[in-house]
């Protein structure tokens, strides 16, 4: 966790947000989205023993570049927090936490599904937000171009929002700006938020690949090019590029 003091705050502020920030494409776009809308934005990352642990380095690079390239956002960008959830990773069996093949399971879900991951992340994020006085929890969950993960559905997150607010006597809002967007539209949203400069930042600095590959830089970013995460990212980028690289809503 960050070494900055985590002073208790009396009430959560509606103009302050906590972004669940992995350092991937989706959470990087969500960070930019939050910085456009909130007066103060903090970030939280989770170390749960993921095979693609390199994303923890990518998130530092993305934050640094956002502050460097977008001074108006830098003034709003607050503390970064990293929470150790390796105990959870040891319990939740998945291709992202163990050396097993990436394939479909008997449940009809990809082996990359980490049972309960987003639910656990949101509980910890809410506890941190409560202490830091942050009223919005922003996540990159999406139910269009996604891998069938049940904890990425909006009805799951609505239920989680209700549970958090009942259990903590707060009024948190879980914001999911990518929920109804395709991956191509996510690239378009990035351009609408920060132009080609933000698109370039996400291509070069963010990390999506489940295999943790950071070797070759493809037009859509770093990655093995074969895992489901790379395939979604590549296909979305190519679709957006072929359509003229327009900003969302243009």
UniProtKB/Swiss-Prot annotation:
CDD domains named among the record's database cross-references: QueC-like
Pfam families listed in its UniProt record: QueC (PF06508)
Catalytic activity of the protein: 7-carboxy-7-deazaguanine + NH4(+) + ATP = 7-cyano-7-deazaguanine + ADP + phosphate + H2O + H(+)
Pathway the protein acts in: Purine metabolism; 7-cyano-7-deazaguanine biosynthesis
Cofactor: Zn(2+)
Annotated residues for binding of Zn(2+): 209, 224, 227, 230
Enzyme class: ligase
Role of this protein: Catalyzes the ATP-dependent conversion of 7-carboxy-7-deazaguanine (CDG) to 7-cyano-7-deazaguanine (preQ(0)).
Name this polypeptide is given: 7-cyano-7-deazaguanine synthase
Source organism phylogeny: Bacteria, Pseudomonadati, Pseudomonadota, Alphaproteobacteria, Caulobacterales
């Amino acid at each position: 966790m960050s070494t900055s003091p985590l002073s208790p705050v009396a009430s959560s502020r509606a103009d302050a947000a906590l972004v669940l920030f992995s350092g991937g494409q989706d959470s990087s776009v969500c960070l930019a989205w939050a910085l456009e809308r909130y007066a103060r934005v903090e970030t939280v990352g989770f170390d749960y023993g993921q095979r693609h642990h390199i994303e923890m380095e990518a998130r530092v690079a993305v934050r640094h570049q956002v502050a460097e390239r977008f001074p108006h956002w830098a003034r709003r960008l607050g503390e970064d927090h990293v929470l150790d959830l390796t105990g959870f990773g040891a319990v939740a069996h998945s291709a992202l936490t163990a050396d097993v093949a990436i394939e479909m399971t008997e449940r009809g879900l990809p082996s990359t599904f980490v049972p309960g991951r987003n639910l656990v992340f949101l509980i910890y994020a809410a506890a941190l937000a409560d202490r830091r006085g942050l009223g919005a929890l922003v996540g990159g969950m999406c139910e269009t171009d996604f891998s069938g993960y049940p904890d990425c559905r909006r009805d799951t997150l609505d239920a989680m929002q209700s549970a958090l607010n009942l259990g903590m006597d707060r009024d948190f809002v879980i914001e999911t700006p990518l929920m109804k967007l395709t991956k191509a539209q996510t690239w378009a949203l990035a351009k609408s938020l920060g132009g080609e400069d933000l698109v370039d930042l996400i291509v070069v600095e963010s990390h999506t690949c489940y295999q943790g590959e950071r070797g070759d830089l493809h037009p859509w970013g770093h990655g093995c090019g074969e895992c489901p995460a790379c395939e979604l990212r590549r296909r979305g980028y190519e679709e957006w590029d072929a359509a003229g690289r327009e900003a969302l809503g243009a």
